[in-house]
């Protein structure tokens, strides 16, 4: 099968790359064809889970402020961002009926707060632009040719077939007969003149992000910067029951498809590329919580200050909300410091976080307030006969969420009325590790951007090859920045491929 431009990957970057390419081709007399190859049964799987299913799809900060949230080469991202700005993304989606709202922190969501509406809008736009989206099509190999590229793929066809029932009387009246899914797998070859790789990184492998693009880039001469999880949960010491840790198998969870079988049918692991890392500090999300972790789980602290400590030194301070989940420390604050924390842990450094639960109050004023409240409590008629521990917990409950009073006391065995203010201003948690690719939001690392032309996103190693999205070595903070960069790089890659096609 032939297409003028093929995009591998039907995620945020891939779908918008196809839209950009199709729009550019439509400007010419002869036009052209654009095809998206997506290996999952449905396109946009990872977009569906962003923002806890609400999809924070962009951030409307101006470039000067937006660029402060890019953690890699800002100059590389700039041409893409200015070519398709956040307003441009909103306008693109609005053109197919998606209305959006701007919330705190300049974050933009669909008005419906449903990520599925964003995916549906992107697919609707693809249809209107004449883009062909082929799902269940996994690219196995890419071979450059004199006229472009040849792709060997595996196409899966799905069909529901009825399950035979030995006795028709067993069928429920008005209910359909039972069925099962029957798969048909066959090889198929695609050829194209221009190729865009937008396969994503390694995060959330269940959505299809399993590092395929890195392999192809490496085969075509590109360097891949070591990858590691970013925007991920940090796991405090004592938070998880590490005795049951199954010793996270990064290969199985984040690099599926690399397993091979020998003559004895024993499962073996194929050699990993040099860029693929393993992490001693990786703690699988499925590791059960400890008793302490259970007490933390499900709680949120709002408007607090978090300081990241590496080797005892404060290296990053952020203000906002933090969530205690079954993974560890998450939410905006946990995610904002996770990139730096993961790098430090991977380097073997000691990492800790320090929470200031009352950042707007000086310690002296807080101490005076605590003593005043304590006097009120101990002189209250209802306090008669109550134990000191009970009264102290009542005091603490007036200062922090009640559900966090027990874990706070469990981690501050020697705290007293006189030392409580200092403890609330510096709640220290040593970090044991982090959740890996299986549940991180974004992959840090990727294809070296110095080997890609920033103004076109074309490879400097292989003419006619373009890259977009998370597969590149670029990542941002949480807050809609990563999706915006995916959209922007996708659109520029698509336009550039189409323009190059027209000029040939």
Predicted feature residues:
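Beta1/beta-strand and adjacent pyrophosphate-binding region of the FAD-binding site
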Residues: 1-13
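Glycine-rich FAD pyrophosphate-binding loop
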Residues: 6, 22-52
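Short glycine/serine/threonine-rich phosphate/pyrophosphate-binding segments
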Residues: 13-18, 199, 206-207, 486
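Conserved N-terminal/central alpha/beta ligand/cofactor-binding core
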Residues: 39-132, 137
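Residue-level recognition of phosphate/Mg2+-coordinating polar/acidic sites
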Residues: 42, 63-65, 73, 82, ...
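Flavin (FAD/FMN) cofactor-binding core of flavoprotein oxidoreductases
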Residues: 112-115, 231-239, 277-282, 434-451
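Predominantly flavin-linked oxidoreductase catalytic cores and closely associated redox partners
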Residues: 121-392, 396
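A conserved FAD-binding loop/helix module that cradles the flavin
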Residues: 203-216, 220, 474-502
């Amino acid at each position: 099968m032939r297409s003028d431009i093929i995009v591998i990957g039907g995620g945020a970057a891939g779908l918008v790359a196809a839209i950009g390419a199709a729009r550019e081709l439509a400007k010419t007399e002869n036009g052209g064809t654009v095809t998206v190859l997506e290996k999952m049964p449905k396109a946009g799987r990872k977009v569906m889970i962003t923002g806890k299913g609400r999809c924070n799809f962009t951030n409307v900060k101006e470039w000067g402020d937006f660029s402060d949230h890019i953690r890699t080469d800002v100059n590389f991202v700039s041409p893409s961002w200015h070519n398709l700005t956040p307003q441009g993304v909103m306008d693109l989606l609005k053109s197919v009926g998606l209305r959006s709202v701007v919330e705190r922190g300049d974050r933009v969501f669909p008005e419906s707060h449903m990520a599925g509406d964003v995916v549906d809008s992107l697919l609707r736009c693809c249809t209107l632009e004449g883009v062909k989206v082929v799902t269940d099509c996994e690219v196995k190999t890419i071979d450059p040719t004199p006229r472009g590229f040849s792709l060997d793929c595996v196409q899966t066809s799905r069909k529901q077939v009825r399950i035979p029932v030995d006795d028709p009387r067993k069928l429920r009246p008005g209910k359909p007969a039972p069925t099962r899914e029957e798969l048909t797998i066959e090889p198929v070859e695609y050829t194209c003149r221009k190729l865009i790789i937008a396969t994503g990184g390694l995060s959330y492998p269940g959505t299809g992000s399993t590092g395929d693009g890195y392999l192809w880039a490496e085969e075509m001469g590109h360097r891949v910067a070591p990858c590691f999880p970013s925007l991920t949960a940090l796991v405090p010491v004592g938070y998880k029951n590490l005795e049951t840790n199954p010793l996270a198998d990064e290969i199985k969870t984040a690099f599926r498809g690399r397993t091979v079988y020998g003559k004895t049918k024993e499962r073996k692991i194929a050699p990993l590329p040099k860029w693929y890392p393993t992490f001693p500090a990786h703690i699988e999300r499925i590791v059960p919580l400890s008793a302490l972790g259970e007490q933390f789980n499900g709680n949120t602290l709002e408007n607090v200050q978090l300081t990241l400590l590496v080797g005892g030194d404060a290296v990053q301070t952020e203000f906002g909300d933090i969530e205690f989940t079954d993974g560890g420390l998450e939410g905006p604050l946990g995610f904002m410091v996770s990139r730096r924390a993961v790098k430090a842990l991977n380097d073997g450094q000691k990492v800790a976080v320090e929470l200031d639960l009352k950042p707007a109050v000086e310690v002296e004023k807080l101490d005076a307030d605590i003593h005043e409240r304590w006097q009120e409590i101990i002189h209250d008629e209802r306090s008669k006969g109550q134990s000191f521990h009970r009264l102290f917990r009542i005091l603490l409950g007036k200062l922090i969420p009640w559900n966090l009073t027990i874990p706070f006391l469990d981690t501050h065995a020697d705290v007293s009325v006189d030392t409580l203010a200092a403890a609330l201003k510096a709640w220290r948690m040593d970090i044991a590790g982090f959740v890996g690719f299986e549940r991180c939001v974004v992959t840090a690392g990727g294809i070296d951007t110095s080997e890609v032309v920033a103004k076109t996103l074309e490879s400097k190693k292989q003419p006619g090859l373009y890259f977009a999205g998370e597969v590149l070595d670029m990542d941002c903070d949480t807050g809609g920045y990563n999706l915006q960069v995916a959209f922007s790089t996708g659109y520029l890659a698509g336009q550039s491929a189409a323009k190059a096609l027209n000029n040939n």
